[in-house]
From Swiss-Prot:
Residues 1-206 form the Glutamine amidotransferase type-1 domain. It comes from the Bacteria. This is Imidazole glycerol phosphate synthase subunit HisH. It is found in: Cytoplasm. Pathway: Amino-acid biosynthesis; L-histidine biosynthesis; L-histidine from 5-phospho-alpha-D-ribose 1-diphosphate: step 5/9. One of its GO terms (biological process) is L-histidine biosynthetic process. Its EC number is 4.3.2.10, 3.5.1.2. Heterodimer of HisH and HisF. It catalyses: 5-[(5-phospho-1-deoxy-D-ribulos-1-ylimino)methylamino]-1-(5-phospho-beta-D-ribosyl)imidazole-4-carboxamide + L-glutamine = D-erythro-1-(imidazol-4-yl)glycerol 3-phosphate + 5-amino-1-(5-phospho-beta-D-ribosyl)imidazole-4-carboxamide + L-glutamate + H(+); L-glutamine + H2O = L-glutamate + NH4(+).
């Protein structure tokens, strides 16, 4: 069963609806025992990094998510949930993240003249081969964000162009993230969630 971390971030229900539509066994939960027993974990998120980390800390979920990642089972962060996977964010001051992928979250530059937040459909360009990211290769997905992750090339699977390349898919072993919302990205987003479900059933895929 896939567990969606329930910590009042806004888009948990949309992720659940998408998994329900696919017929994927899933559950919303903040219970550490249920989270640790999951075959895969999804960390969604909408809003500010600082408030999201505060909510996770209040529920004592930070060490639980870190422990789940250490099991080697697939973990997927979505939008703000992807940003939380990194070491820190500079949104409204500096805030420590989960530290599961090296890197920082910084503001999208405004000197390109493009509107911030980056909102709407944009294409993903793969930067290295990966079975999960391949689903989204040269495909448009739905973005809503004002900050983006900066990380090492080996952890960047895809970027999207918005005045400059912005990180759109990341991976470190079994820990993955999408800056876009697969649950709001139509058929291609559903295909990505289906691929994540397949990863929870095949240990080799979770290490790809």
């Amino acid at each position: 069963m896939i567990v969606i971390v329930d910590y009042d971030t806004g888009n948990t229900r949309n992720v659940k609806k998408a998994l329900d539509y696919l017929g994927v066994n899933n559950q919303l939960s903040a219970d550490p025992a249920i989270i640790m027993a999951a075959s895969g974990l999804i960390l969604p998120g909408v809003g500010a990094f600082k408030e999201a980390m505060k909510a996770l800390n209040q529920r004592q979920l930070v060490p639980v998510i870190q422990a789940f990642a250490a099991t080697g089972k697939p973990l997927l962060g979505i939008c703000l949930g992807m940003q939380l996977l990194f070491d820190r964010s500079f949104e409204f001051g500096e805030t420590a993240g989960l530290g599961l992928i090296p890197g920082e979250v910084v503001a999208i530059p405004t000197d390109s003249g493009l509107a911030v937040p980056h909102m709407g459909w944009n294409t993903n360009s793969l930067t290295q081969p990966d079975l999960f990211a391949a689903v989204f290769a040269d495909q448009a997905t739905y973005f809503v964000h004002s900050f983006y992750a900066t990380t090492l090339p080996q952890f960047t699977l895809a970027t999207t162009d918005y005045g400059q390349p912005l990180t759109s898919i990341v991976r470190r072993n079994n820990v993955l993230g999408t800056q876009f919302h697969p649950e709001k990205s139509g058929a291609i987003g559903l295909a990505g969630l289906k691929k994540f479900k397949e990863m929870t059933e095949d240990e080799a895929l979770s290490r790809d």
